[in-house]
Regions:
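Acidic, proline/glycine-rich low-complexity IDRs
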Residues: 128-158
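Beta-strand-rich cores of mature extracytoplasmic or soluble domains
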Residues: 89, 98-102, 113, 118-119
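Short beta-strand micro-motifs enriched in acidic
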Residues: 94, 102-107
Length: 158
């Protein structure tokens, strides 16, 4: 479990409001493992549909301080002035190490940010920043689009 105090500390540290549904989930299940852990997105750089796996980052708490999950307070994108993005905060990672993020760029003071995927090792030729692809309009839409890879592709990806 993650306390409201820890959530408030995170929001205060970055000056954001997390989505209510995310708070509801994370206060009950810190860094939850999920079966339906895949999502689709459009790679506008290559002009093709892609998919990715996903796992939540978590918060260090008293109950996991000796084996904490990937710590959500480590905001590599927000803190990276050269390759990162202002108002983009990761809350999960893909199996390839890419960042699944809350994207507040359209509304930095809002509480229902878009969801995006930031590729950790590929860069936009024009800006030099990490590639960033939109995924969902908000956290609820993101959860709704998650699927189990084996159910969708029983014979593997073809």
């Amino acid at each position: 479990m993650v306390s409201q105090e820890i959530i408030s500390d995170f929001e205060g540290a970055f000056g954001i409001k997390l989505p209510k549904l995310y708070i509801k989930l994370i206060t009950k299940h810190n860094a939850p493992g999920i079966i339906q852990s895949y999502f689709d997105y459009y790679d506008s750089y290559r002009n093709e549909d892609e998919y990715s796996s996903f796992g939540f980052e978590g918060f260090e708490t008293e109950s996991n301080k000796h084996e904490p999950p990937e710590n959500i307070f480590s905001q590599y994108l927000y803190d990276d002035d050269i390759y990162g993005y202002e108002h983009v905060y990761s809350f999960g990672r893909s199996g390839c190490g890419d960042f699944v993020c809350f994207d507040y760029r359209d509304n930095p003071k809002g509480s229902e940010p878009k969801i995006c995927l930031v590729i950790h090792d590929e860069y936009d030729e024009e800006t030099g920043k990490h590639l960033l692809f939109p995924v969902a309009e908000n956290f609820e839409a993101f959860l709704d689009m998650l699927y189990d890879f084996d159910e969708r592709y029983p014979n593997g990806y073809e």
